[in-house]
Amino acid sequence: VMAILIAVFIEPLGAVSYVFGAILSATAGYAGMSVATMANARTTEAAKDGPAKALPIAFRGGAVMGFAVAGLALAGLMIVYILFVMVLEIDNAFEVVTAYGLGASSIALFSRVGGGIYTKAADVGADLVGKVEAGIPEDDPRNPATIADNVGDNVGDVAGMGADLFESYAGSLIAPISLVAFALALSADEASDAVNVSLLVFPMAIAFVGMLASILGSFLVRGGTSTDSKDLSHALHLGTNVAMGITAGATIAVAFWLFGSEDAFDAPLGLAIAVLGGLVVGWALGKTAEYYTSDHYPPVKKIADQSETGPATTVLGGISVGKISVGASVVLIILGVGVAYWGGELAFDQIGSLDGGIYGIAVAAIGMLATLGVVVSVDAYGPIADNAGGIAEMAHLPAEVREATDELDSLGNTTAAVAKGFAIASAAVTALALFFSFKEAVGLESIDIVKVCLLYTSPSPRD
C-alpha cells in the first residue's frame, strides 16, 4: 500500500526504491535468523568443552546477521545512488534515494515492535506456566512454551534488532546525502561536480571503511582457554575495539583524500573530528551500557543483593538503576552532537544554504554506526547463547554444559544492551539531521515552536 501511495503521489521510481529497501531489510533478518537457529545447536555441542570453546561459534553465527545487515544496507544504498543519480540522472533522484530508507523503516517497525511483543509474551508466558504454576525449571521440555520462548529470542533479538539497526544505518547514510542535495538544490547532473561529489560520497566512504574494519576485527574474536567471565567479555569486545581503532585511522585518511588540498587542512580535519566524535560517543555508550548491565560492576551486584529481601526491592532497584543509566547516555549524546557541530563548522561555514555544523552532525551518526557489522554480530551472539542453554536443558545434558551456556548467556544480556544503546543514540542524531533535511526540502525559513501547525508545510513556506 505504501509503495502504491509513493508511486501515485510522489515518484513512481520512488516506489521501486522503497520496495528494494524493504526487501533487503527483510532478507538480512531472514538470513540472520536462519543461521542463528542453526548455530545454537552447534554452540550447545561446543559448550561440552567449556564456554571458551562455544563463544566463537556463537559469535560467528551472530556475524552472519551483523554483516548481512551492514553489507546489504550499504550495498543497497550504493546501488540506488549509482542507478538513479549517476546512471539514469532522473528528476527527483534524491527523493528516490530517500525512499530506500523509508522501505527499511517500514520493515523495522514490524520486525522490532511485532517481534519484541512476541518475544516478551512468549518469555513471560513460559515462565508463568512453568516456574509459577507447574514448578518446573526454565527451558524444561515438559513445558511446550519453551519452544515459543526460544523462537522468540530469535525473532525479537536477532531479526528485530537487526531490522532496527538496518534502518538506523540506512538512515544515517541517507541523512547527509539528502541534506546536501536539498540544501544545495542539486539535480542529478549537478551531483558530479567536484565539491558536491566529495560531500555526497564521504558518508558512503566512511561506511565502507568501517565495514572493512569490522570484518578484520571479527577475525580477532577467539575464545582462548580461559573460562573466566571477564576474559570471555574481553575476547568478545576485542573485535569491536580493534574495528573502531582501524576505522578511526581510515576516517582521517578518507577525509584528507576527499577534502584535502595543499593549502587547506580545516575541511578534512573538521569532518574527521565530527566522524571521530560520533565513533567515540558510540564506544562510550557501549561502555556505559556494559557498566550498568554487566555482573562485573557494582550496579548489577547491588540489584542482586537487593533480591535477598524479595521481588519488590529487586524491581525497584532495577528501575532506579535503569533510570540513572539514561543520564550518562544523554550527556554523551549531547557532547557528541556538540563536537560534531564544532567539527563541521571548522570544515566550512556555509556552502549555499548548507550549514557545516549540521553536516558535521549528520556524518557523526555514521561514525556511531561505522562498525555496525561487528556490533550486531556481538548482539546477535546473545540469543544464540540463550537458545544453546535451552537446548542443553531440553536434551538433559550434564549440568556443566548448562553452566557453560549460562555464562555465555549472561554475557549476551550485556551485549544486547550495548546494541540497544547504539540503535537509540544513532537514531536520535540521525533524526536531527533528517529534520534539517526536511526543512531544506520544503523551504522552511524558520520554525516557530509555539505554533500548533509546526510540521505542516505547503508549496509556499509563507502560506
Q: Where do the PLM segments sit?
A:
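Hydrophobic packing and interface segments
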Residues: 1-458, 462
